[in-house]
Amino acid sequence: MSTKKIEQWEIERYWEIFASLSNGQPHLNSSQAASVLRNSRLRDEQLEKVWDLADVDGDGELDFEEFCVAMRLVFDLVNGELQEVPRVLPDWLVPESKAHLVQAGRALSGRPEQFERIEDEDDTPGLKDGFDWYMNPADKSKYEEIYSANRNHRGEVTFESLQGLYDSLDVPDTDVRSAWNLVNPSASPAINKDATLAFLHILNYRHEGFRIPRTIPASLRASFENNKIDYQVDNARPAQKWGADGSTETLTGRKTKFGDTYLSRLGVGGKGSYTPKGTDFSDTIQDEEWEKVRLRRELAEMEAKLDAANKASEGRRDRPRNDGRPNWVLIKKEALQLLEYKERELRELREGTGRAKEGQDLERLRDDIKTVGDQVEGLKAHLAERKDVLADVRRQIEEERLHR
């Protein structure tokens, strides 16, 4: 059993960040959370997977527990504790209050057990048995693109909004309505995201020649009947999902892939030119925690380079070069360049420019400023020492010349 856990000091740090972003609300939407998550410099697909894992209840927002999960995953990725985003949320990261939701999600994401199927009375020739509720990642991504392109301001999809899709499919109207009724047991005018994905999955299989199922798993039916899920589409459109490769073969290998024609018309599918309309966070205020992480990483890189330079310098010192004398001109030039860089970095931190964006909490950056200041003073002392050594070498050279 894993002994890992989120420590109390981490929870307190995450709470400070959460409170500063939530404006007193109990949840963060995608726009608010992205202002700190994107500062980790992780790739968009990694952040998307982190969000999907952390959003345990699937409401499109992060409460404080889910935010802690997301932050720990991101920090572990940044610090090298994780090489990639895990496929499922580790048990030690699952919030106790949401353990039942994680268990249900895992049951739905895998291949569920096959339920006994009532024999279809449809006499349409050529239809096949073998409908599978499992959605592979490529199909699910395409379903989510269709959902995103047709949802209303409440995050729901109406039957009429998908008429363009129906026209592009080889599915009779009666079967389309049968699939709609199957995922809409309450006969509502619109269905939520989970029901929409299941509806599109049924149409996909029917388009490929499979019979429409007569029943749905109880766990899915419960999620269809729950209309309280709020995906917060008013706040921000979610980032574009990675679509399936257009070269992937269909189930039959004979028809256009489900939804490709429809998505192409919308300009959001396959290899189209669709770009997400989400908020641009490129000018968002940098979070000091990420700044500290990056500074530590840069410091480690600089120390490694310094060690390598020292070793190379020692190697050159052991070899006869320029009458056995070290290249003090080059050493002085490099030391001055490093000093100039550190002074500029310190000046930017004090003035709030450059990496330290306007509006940063300067109180939290004092430690970083002090560290950089100490480095600058150390470099100045080192430069003075090198100058003394250089003067001494010149003096020795001059004395040697006079003795001759």
Swiss-Prot record:
- Looking at the record, which segments are called Disordered? 306-325
UniProt keyword list: Actin-binding, Calcium, Cell membrane, Coiled coil, Cytoplasm, Cytoskeleton, Endocytosis, Endosome, Membrane, Metal-binding, Repeat
Q: Where is the EF-hand domain?
A: 42-77
Describe the location of the EH domain by residue ranges: 10-100, 139-227
Molecular function terms in GO for this entry?
actin binding; calcium ion binding
This entry carries the following GO cellular component terms, namely: actin cortical patch; endosome membrane; plasma membrane
Q: Which Pfam families match?
A: EH (PF12763), End3 (PF12761)
**Membrane-protein topology:** Peripheral membrane protein
The family classification in the record reads: Belongs to the END3 family.
The record describes the protein's role as: Component of the PAN1 actin cytoskeleton-regulatory complex required for the internalization of endosomes during actin-coupled endocytosis. The complex links the site of endocytosis to the cell membrane-associated actin cytoskeleton. Mediates uptake of external molecules and vacuolar degradation of plasma membrane proteins. Plays a role in the proper organization of the cell membrane-associated actin cytoskeleton and promotes its destabilization.
Q: Where does Ca(2+) bind?
A: 55, 57, 59, 61, 66
Database matches in CDD domains: EH (cd00052)
Q: Where is the composition biased (Basic and acidic residues)?
A: 306-324
Mind giving the lineage of the organism this protein is from? Eukaryota, Fungi, Dikarya, Ascomycota, Pezizomycotina
Q: Which PANTHER family does the annotation name?
A: EH DOMAIN (PTHR11216)
- InterPro entries per record: EF-hand-dom_pair, EF_Hand_1_Ca_BS, EF_hand_dom, EH_dom, End3
First and last residue of the signal peptide = none
Q: Which GO terms describe its biological process?
A: actin filament organization; endocytosis; endosomal transport
Q: How does it assemble?
A: Component of the PAN1 actin cytoskeleton-regulatory complex.
**Which protein are we looking at?**
Actin cytoskeleton-regulatory complex protein end3
**Residue ranges of coiled coil:** 280-399
